[in-house]
């Protein structure tokens, strides 16, 4: 390790600029620059020119000398002394160098962790091999919700409960224009919420390249611009996310199938679309494409949402079939071929032909290229990094958060995990509690859940009682002329405490957070029933569902308390 003494720096931003300049010098592997101490600690290759180091610093207007070199002039100018006095007044007397935190990734978990670590006083290096922002803003949540919204509007123009007095019209879909509008909003949000924030934070240095562990204290970064750099750290967070999984179906890899990434970026709407998958991404996009004009066939190995309460899958299946989406339950593709611009799927129910094939059967952690074994970081059989509730891995100084772990794959979970990981990396003690985690699927009707289903509660030895309220009992749904779906409450028998809610409703995502707060605050179903809810809102359905435990809500007048 080579140390430089640097005079003239006046702030942490100065140190960041010096670090950047030194790391551009040939032979410099990494640099840790401390403004309070006035030093730069360098990992350099043998033969690196000391003159090149001091010249790089001098080019920024500062003076640098090797720490073990004899002083050439003991006289310090008044300006330098004043800079030293000002710096000493602004900083703690301990003059300890900032904790060096490396974050691999730039999505929800990574950004939350980087910003929290800086808030806690750390210096952060963020490493991203691709586009800043991760899955959510670029190829996930944001573009998919825009496409779903477009499809919803197209559907209402074509068909609504008010067609008798407002005749429907067949919409013209200009997919290229819609895609341009979608991508413009993606780029706007990426800059506002990711790139702009990183650019404006002097305590965060961004490296564009692919990282792999050298050991449990350093990384090797293959820079996108060429060459490699060794980056040392005190703490490291792995937040590399996940990618679409590809099932081992013969012929699939040789075909031009879509994942969600390609589907969201397509500038055309296929006439026929086959979808392999039976959960969130598959079903959101299946319905969106159907509403934009595709003839959609969904292949489900089991039933739709087979891991959830059976009533959820039944309700969504009924809604899909009512819109003309073909749902093939208990159906698997055993062979995929692509001939003459057409997909041919061999299934347990015969042959299926389509113009495009969307495969959305889950996601796999982005951990294979990280050389985690070099740092002693354990993964499970699926390649997900094993962590505890504090996001700690099996290696003491390395943490992980988000979709590269076995945490639920929601961006808000990833962000919460990243924040708590940063607290723990900087000396705190925070845990991630997912006992009241909401989940929303943006089909129409939407699916929203929190807490236990009945089956999950019974698996954990909890005796339950439950009620299911269909939406024809909810005034808001009646006023909307859309009574598809239900609200189901699960309570602990004996105590009456609410422990789970499952909802299928056009606006289920807007009501579930009330259920989250009720569960978090250990409310009984009677306490929920006694609350004031505004009339003609969908969330009032929670109150009505709670009332069904003690009375027949069909016999109540409007908004009866």
From Swiss-Prot:
What is the required cofactor set for this protein?
A: FAD
Q: What else is known?
A: The active site is a redox-active disulfide bond.
Q: What is this protein called?
A: Mercuric reductase
Tell me if Acyltransferase is a UniProt keyword of this record. Answer: no
Q: Which residues bind a metal cation?
A: 11, 14
Q: Which SUPFAM superfamilies match?
A: FAD/NAD(P)-binding domain, FAD/NAD-linked reductases, dimerisation (C-terminal) domain, HMA, heavy metal-associated domain
Which keywords belong to this entry? Disulfide bond, FAD, Flavoprotein, Mercuric resistance, Mercury, Metal-binding, NADP, Oxidoreductase, Plasmid, Redox-active center
Any Pfam family matching the protein? Pyr_redox_dim
Query: What is the protein's known function?
Result: Resistance to Hg(2+) in bacteria appears to be governed by a specialized system which includes mercuric reductase. MerA protein is responsible for volatilizing mercury as Hg(0).
Share what the entry says about its subunit structure, partners included. Homodimer.
* Domain HMA intervals: 1-65
Question: Which positions are annotated as binding Hg(2+)?
Answer: 558-559
Q: Which gene encodes it?
A: merA
Report the PROSITE patterns cross-referenced here.
Answer: HMA_1 (PS01047), HMA_2 (PS50846), PYRIDINE_REDOX_1 (PS00076)
Q: Which reaction does it catalyse?
A: Hg + NADP(+) + H(+) = Hg(2+) + NADPH
Report the record's Gene Ontology biological process terms: detoxification of mercury ion
Cite a single GO MF annotation.
Answer: mercury ion binding
Organism per entry: Enterobacter agglomerans
**Entry's family note:** Belongs to the class-I pyridine nucleotide-disulfide oxidoreductase family.
Q: Which stretches are annotated as coiled coil?
A: none
The EC number of this protein is 1.16.1.1
Q: Gene3D superfamilies in the record, alphabetically? A: 3.30.390.30, 3.30.70.100, FAD/NAD(P)-binding domain
Note the superkingdom of the native organism: Bacteria
SS bond list: 136-141
Q: How is the cofactor bound?
A: Binds 1 FAD per subunit.
- Note whether Flavoprotein occurs among the keywords: yes
